[in-house]
Structures are given as structure tokens and as C-alpha cells.
């Protein structure tokens, strides 16, 4: 077999396994007997660490399997049957999830992007145009807004942009959901001014990516307002996103949120990106 250790790969950020600290902890705990479905001490510890990192002590935290399942589950849980989710026309749920949202019975209502992002003004106009239409009761109602941090183009929402989106969403009773599949990279970017605390303040739900950020798999959904999505555990199960061996995800997120690892784990990627940027100038 060809030795590929010295080769550079640009295809993806999840071609390798997991951070050594995660693998070490998984091996140390491998033969322990724990309760299933995320009711174990490791998962509870991970949830508490995430609440602390987000400065959201009352938040509901749930660990799911992967990004597409997470998006499909959260969006379905937040929408009524006749509602759709607003997203950029380049948004991940609109372009690279094989119609998973539509498969769940909800339309993705796309708006034109600017560098991968959408604005508060666009949301305001979309809502106004919807209710100004005499036939709006025959149409798919905008029921929530989806963004990702970073975007599909690798751009970042600023704190000011996020706050503006949050304001218009709350004025129009539209939950704001942030896809954080690659959130570790956003947090590590020198251009970033949005913290986990900001995400908890300005969004109705967001997830902290594990699969693309150092874990073998797993995403942590944070719902800042406790009880905001009733029976979410059961909804996760219904969508096939619940792990029987839940502690495997709990251990991973427990390690990611020990000694600031998650906040550091994206830095090598940022440093490499700066090297590429400098070389292309």
C-alpha cells in the first residue's frame, strides 16, 4: 500500500479519523457498562460542558449522529406541516443534502446569496411579499430561517449581521437555526467575532459540529431556551438520529470541550489557509 502520510490532501476536512485525545478516551472506556441512548454520565458531562462554553446554563443539548440528520430533524421539529425554511440559494440544505428537507415534507425557500450569506433585509422583504400576496394562504409559509457558520463559501457572519437576522426573525416569529457543521473553523478564524455565547443569544437552535471538527462522528444541538422544542428526544428517535450507544458521542464531545480543545482544533486549518492565501497573492 502506498505511503500517503506525507501527501497533502485538499478534498475534505474529514478524511482522517479523530483527535488522539478522543481515541484515547474511547479506548480507556471501551469496556465500561453504561446506560444507553445518551442517559450515561459521559453524555451528561459533555452537555454540561457545552452549556458552560455557550454561557447557556438552561439550554437543552442533544447529541445526534451526522449533519444531514441533524438539519432534517431540527427543521422538521421547528416547522408546521404547511411551512418552509428560508435559506440562501447556496445553502447546504438547498444544494448538498439530496433533498432531505423536502423528503421530510418541507420546502426550502431560497433567496439569492451574497458571498454565501443572506441578510435581515432579505428576510423582511420575503415576509412582506408573502403576506402582500392575495393568495398567500395557498402558498408555503416561511416558518424559519436557516444559515450556516461558516457558509458554503467559507464566509462568516459577523456579530452585527447575526444580531440583525435574529431581530427580524423574532419580530416575525421565525426561529433562526444555525448549522455549525464546521463551526470550529469559524471560531478559530482571525476574522471571526461571533462566539458560542453569541450563537446562544441570537439563535433559537444551533449545532456544534463534531464530524468535520475532530470527532469520529456526531453533532451537538443546542436549544438555548429550555423546552423550546417539546419531546425533541422522541423526534430524534423518529428521524433515526438517536444512538443506542449514546455514550460514544458523549465521550467525544466531552473531550472536545475539555481544556478548550474545540476552540483550538480549527487553528491548524486557519494557519494552512493563510499559507495558501499568501502563496496566491
Report each predicted region and the residues it spans.
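Conserved PLP-enzyme active-site core in the AAT-like
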Residues: 2-281
Amino acid at each position: 500500500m502506498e505511503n500517503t502520510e506525507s501527501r497533502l490532501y485538499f478534498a475534505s476536512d474529514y478524511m482522517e479519523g479523530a483527535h488522539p485525545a478522543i481515541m484515547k478516551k474511547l479506548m480507556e472506556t471501551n469496556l465500561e457498562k453504561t446506560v444507553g441512548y445518551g442517559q450515561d454520565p459521559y453524555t451528561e458531562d459533555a452537555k454540561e460542558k457545552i452549556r458552560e462554553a455557550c454561557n447557556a446554563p438552561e439550554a437543552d443539548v442533544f447529541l445526534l449522529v451526522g449533519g444531514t440528520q441533524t438539519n432534517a430533524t431540527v427543521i422538521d421539529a421547528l416547522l408546521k406541516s404547511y411551512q418552509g425554511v428560508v435559506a440562501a440559494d447556496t445553502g447546504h440544505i438547498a444544494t448538498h443534502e439530496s433533498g432531505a428537507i423536502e423528503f421530510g415534507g418541507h420546502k426550502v425557500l431560497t433567496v439569492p446569496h451574497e458571498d454565501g450569506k443572506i441578510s435581515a433585509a432579505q428576510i423582511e422583504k420575503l415576509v412582506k411579499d408573502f403576506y402582500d400576496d392575495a393568495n398567500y394562504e395557498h402558498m408555503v409559509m416561511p416558518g424559519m430561517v436557516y444559515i450556516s457558520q461558516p457558509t458554503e463559501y467559507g464566509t462568516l457572519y459577523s456579530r452585527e449581521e447575526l444580531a440583525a437576522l435574529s431581530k427580524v426573525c423574532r419580530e416575525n416569529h421565525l426561529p433562526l437555526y444555525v448549522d455549525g457543521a464546521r463551526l470550529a473553523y469559524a471560531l478559530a478564524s482571525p476574522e471571526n467575532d461571533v462566539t458560542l455565547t453569541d450563537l446562544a443569544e441570537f439563535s433559537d437552535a444551533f449545532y456544534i459540529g463534531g464530524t468535520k471538527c475532530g470527532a469520529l462522528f456526531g453533532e451537538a444541538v443546542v436549544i438555548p431556551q429550555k423546552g423550546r422544542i417539546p419531546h425533541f428526544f422522541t423526534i430524534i428517535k423518529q428521524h433515526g438520529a438517536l444512538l443506542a450507544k449514546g455514550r460514544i458521542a458523549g465521550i467525544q464531545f466531552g473531550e472536545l470541550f475539555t481544556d478548550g480543545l474545540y476552540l483550538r482544533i480549527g487553528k491548524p486549518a486557519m494557519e494552512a489557509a493563510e499559507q495558501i492565501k499568501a502563496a496566491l497573492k
